[in-house]
Curated annotation (Swiss-Prot):
Residues 486-698 are cytoplasmic. Residues 22-464 are extracellular. The gene is Il17rc. The keyword DNA-binding does not apply. Receptor for IL17A and IL17F, major effector cytokines of innate and adaptive immune system involved in antimicrobial host defense and maintenance of tissue integrity. Receptor for IL17A and IL17F homodimers as part of a heterodimeric complex with IL17RA. Receptor for the heterodimer formed by IL17A and IL17B as part of a heterodimeric complex with IL17RA. Has also been shown to be the cognate receptor for IL17F and to bind IL17A with high affinity without the need for IL17RA. Upon binding of IL17F homodimer triggers downstream activation of TRAF6 and NF-kappa-B signaling pathway. Induction: Induced in lung epithelial cells upon bacterial and fungal infection. Up-regulated in lung epithelial cells by IL17F; this might account for a persistent activation via a positive feedback loop. GO terms for molecular function: coreceptor activity; interleukin-17 receptor activity; signaling receptor binding. It comes from the Eukaryota. This is Interleukin-17 receptor C. Residues 1-21 form the signal peptide. GO terms for biological process: defense response to fungus; granulocyte chemotaxis; inflammatory response; interleukin-17A-mediated signaling pathway; positive regulation of cytokine production involved in inflammatory response; positive regulation of interleukin-6 production. Keywords: Cell membrane, Disulfide bond, Glycoprotein, Inflammatory response, Membrane, Receptor, Signal, Transmembrane, Transmembrane helix.
Length: 698
């Protein structure tokens, strides 16, 4: 059909193939018959009244087949109308009846059989809003009257119709001896026919081509400049429904770009001129496009509206099947329950359900096309909770009073009982016993197809795994005794104290020396917190809040606060004690931690909680302010062993080689101290010192 060629040309992005039509110059209707027949067309139309069926008195002439052909009726060369030519094929039906009246001579019978046959053939034509009926008288000579044989055809010119209209044609005789013939045809529009210069309504019709431009689809509207027309982009989910997406009046020519992800099979286009009574071009060029079908499945959604009720949302009809399936807890593919449960055709945008199905969390629905699952949703997942480890038994009717039972597994439906090595086969007798004693839940039943039963597997799982649980208990007991044997080591590990190292910001070289001390202490083992390792938290919360939080936490855990005194720290402490204004540098947090710890010293709460240290050669012990001397004061690295004992609270160091470890710490501190003092606090002091990985105390 021309319409098919039109859509094919759109898909290829080329000009469509068009059909040239025969032209009729006569404005009146005419009729003609094939050789041997005579025809006469009644003037004007007749009433379209088929009447009731009657019995044929003998051989009668009846229509047997209808054909149509499109032509142009052209009173003027450029003023034509689309017209439907109808060809009616005729045949003789029935036989001569034997005479019932006595006394008829053979000559009279022969005379009646040598007479010609006549018939009145009615052609009924409907194409909204047009409805017409034409009457043809057809005569067949006696020599052509052969019952059961075709005698020829009659041609009627013609019924006028609109471009793109759907026409219906009926044919019958008066009186009517058989059921009327009928024919329905969709006429092409201006695009599919060579009529642009012949039919005035097609003169200003926009032409449209579809092509691909990368990830986009380009709609090219070939319209003369300054020509106004309307463009409508819409969805047609069902034949009689239309959902408009975009409508606009445009001036040609135009290029309209669509994203390829927006294409779906029911996306259609209408274009028409703004001239009065202009024809509309309507087509859906993406119906057979594979990409449009893929997009449709990506857009489609399967929603559970309520327990057991779902809805498939999609902009177009989906060519799929909806199947009830069983989802096992192991996340294996959902197994369709067809048979015995019949599947449904996919219906979009309407609530659906499987009737007579009882609720179970493992029952789901899936939408499939050509054995491929596209969408799936579990109907009772929200109302009945997670999947259950139940075994689904399928009871099938095998005879009038006979049934068979099989267990649905990933490998298929295992007959019960069975010698297979599957889980259901091993428990076959027990499952059958549960089934016969009505311990299983019936999910679905059909007197002709069968039933579905869900059998709980909890008791079989408990019995099977009892030895495993005993083994786990024995393993747990063994692990418990092993941990008891390691009790001393764990206590030693828990006995390692936490320490907060507080210092002043005396320059980059001094900060590297502080970092070396913190790294060395963290290997003793001690859990060390220092602001150098927590710059991000310090910046986020503020120095005062960070120091206060760390001090309170460490003291609650029984830890110790280490005060590292330097000349700058001593000077600021003196200013604090003399109630002088302290203006710290941009990176100096000394004022913050002084406000946290000084009340403990002034109120006598420092003993056992604080330790003071300073580096050899950098400070004289008498320089430390007197309020801070109530806490032990050590010089590093010369008094390192005593300092470590004070940090451990009198406990011995951890197992291993403590003397070697103390010696390594001493050497590390002395090397860092020598490096910083030799550089005279020059920028870049101690850059070669690797602080190593450090543990921040949260």
């Amino acid at each position: 059909m021309p319409v098919s060629w039109f859509l094919l040309s759109l898909a290829l992005g080329r000009n469509p193939v068009v059909v040239s039509l025969e032209r009729l110059m006569e404005p009146q209707d005419t009729a003609r018959c094939s050789l041997g027949l005579s025809c006469h067309l009644w003037d004007g139309d007749v009433l379209c009244l088929p009447g009731s069926l009657q019995s044929a008195p003998g051989p009668v002439l009846v229509p047997t087949r209808l054909q149509t052909e499109l032509v142009l009726r052209c009173p003027q060369k450029t003023d034509c109308a689309l017209c439907v030519r109808v060809v009616v094929h005729l045949a003789v039906h029935g036989h001569w009846a034997e005479p019932e009246e006595a006394g008829k001579s053979d000559s009279e019978l022969q005379e009646s059989r040598n007479a010609s046959l006549q018939a009145q053939v009615v052609l009924s034509f409907q194409a909204y809003p047009i409805a017409r009926c034409a009457l043809l008288e057809v005569q067949v000579p006696a020599d052509l009257v052969q019952p059961g044989q075709s005698v020829g055809s009659a041609v009627f010119d013609c019924f006028e119709a609109s471009l793109g209209a759907e026409v219906q044609i009926w044919s019958y005789t008066k009186p009517r001896y058989q059921k009327e013939l009928n024919l329905t045809q969709q006429l092409p529009d201006c695009r599919g026919l060579e009529v642009r210069d012949s039919i005035q309504s097609c003169w200003v019709l926009p032409w449209l081509n579809v092509s691909t431009d990368g990830d986009n689809v380009l709609l090219t509207l070939d319209v003369s400049e300054e020509q106004d027309f309307s463009f409508l982009l819409y969805l047609r989910p069902v034949p009689d429904a239309l959902k408009s997406l975009w409508y606009k009046n445009l001036t040609g020519p135009q290029n309209i770009t669509l994203n390829h992800t927006d294409l779906v099979p029911c996306l259609c286009i209408q274009v028409w001129s703004l001239e009065p009574d202009s024809e509309r071009v309507e087509f859906c060029p993406f119906r057979e496009d594979p990409g449009a079908h893929r997009n449709l499945w990506h857009i489609a959604r399967l929603r559970v509206l309520s327990p057991g009720v779902w809805q498939l949302d999609a902009p177009c009809c989906l060519p799929g099947k909806v199947t009830l399936c069983w989802q096992a807890p192991d996340q294996s593919p959902c197994q369709p329950l067809v048979p015995p449960v019949p599947q449904k055709n996919a219906t979009v945008n309407e609530p659906q359900d499987f009737q007579l199905v009882a609720g179970h969390p493992n029952l789901c629905v899936q939408v499939s096309t050509w054995e491929k699952v596209q969408l799936q949703a579990c109907l009772w997942a929200d109302s009945l909770g997670p999947f259950k480890d139940d075994m689904l038994l399928v009871e099938m009717k095998t005879g009038l009073n006979n049934t068979s039972v099989c267990a649905l597994e990933p490998s298929g439906c295992t007959p019960l009982p069975s010698m297979a090595s599957t889980r259901a086969a091993r428990l076959g007798e027990e499952l059958l016993q549960d089934f016969r004693s009505h311990q299983c839940m019936q999910l679905w039943n059909d007197d002709n197809m069968g039933s579905l039963w869900a059998c709980p597997m909890d008791k079989y799982i408990h019995r099977r795994w009892v030895l495993v649980w005993l083994a786990c208990l024995l393993l747990a007991a063994a692990l418990f005794f092993f941990l008891l044997l390691k009790k001393d080591r764990r206590k030693a590990a828990r006995g390692s104290r936490t320490a907060l190292l507080l210092h002043s910001a005396d320059g980059a070289g001094y900060e590297r020396l502080v970092g070396a001390l913190a790294s060395a202490l963290s290997q003793m083992p001690l859990r060390v917190a220092v602001d150098l390792w927590s710059r991000r938290e310090l910046s986020a919360h503020g120095a005062l809040a960070w120091f206060h939080h760390q001090r309170r936490r460490i003291l609650q855990e029984g830890g110790v606060v280490i005060l590292l005194f330097s000349p700058a720290a001593v000077a600021q402490c003196q200013q604090w004690l003399q109630l002088q204004t302290v203006e710290p540098g941009p990176h100096d947090a000394l004022a913050a931690w002084l406000s946290c710890v000084l009340p403990d010293f002034l109120q006598g709460r420092a003993t056992g909680r604080y330790v003071g240290v300073y580096f050899d050669g950098l400070l004289h012990p008498d320089s430390v302010p007197s309020p801070f001397r109530v806490a032990p004061l050590f010089s590093l690295p010369s008094q390192l062993p005593a300092f470590l004992d004070a940090l451990q609270g009198g406990c011995s160091t951890s197992a291993g080689r403590p003397a070697d470890r103390v010696e390594r710490v001493t050497q590390a501190l002395r090397s860092a101290l020598d490096s910083c003092t030799s550089s005279s606090e020059a920028p870049g002091c101690c850059e070669e010192w690797d602080l190593g990985p450090c543990t921040t105390l949260e």
